[in-house]
């Protein structure tokens, strides 16, 4: 059984939109800490702690108040695309990205609509939070990218099923090969007469 198509993922996103937004909001508010803007190790620890419990989380990074990335991309996953994104992105202008534009106008966690990730080339959504100091001034923004298909699977409890798909394919392939062998033997026997 193959993964869902992009259209299937978008349809599922709209079905589970509120649950996805609440989940990402709770994850992002749980990691918010002033040290994330100054300490790359704290940022890495925060993401790896999140990824341990939420396997759909792809990347975490921070932006300054102007929308310029102030940290490197922090990636704890071992997916094929992760090495090309890990440790990059610092000083990139993200001021026109949807997550920044939404977060700039809000004091709460915002979640983008699905879009193709430039890092993973998969559909993703981003959650963003404007981080304020004690006086209410913006320090910057915390951005969390998640794989949309994996998030939907997590919410629907499909992660275990997906893990067994290769085993099912193998078993089905053996059955099909066995049936072809039976057909071949029968055809051989029929032509020998």
What are these regions (language model features)?
Residues 2-45:
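Extracellular/periplasmic ligand-binding regions of membrane signal-transduction receptors
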Residues 45-53, 102:
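Amphipathic alpha-helical regulatory segments at dimerization interfaces
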Residues 52-69, 109, 159-173:
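Short N-terminal helix-loop-first-beta-strand/juxtamembrane motif that initiates sensory/input modules
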Residues 64, 117, 133:
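Acidic surface patches and DE-rich sequence motifs
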Residues 64-82:
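GAF sensory/regulatory domain recognition
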Residues 77-115:
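Extracytoplasmic/periplasmic sensor domains and loops in membrane signaling proteins
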Residues 120-159:
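Conserved beta-strands of PAS-like sensory domains
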Residues 164-193:
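Alpha-helical transmembrane segments and their helix-membrane boundary motifs
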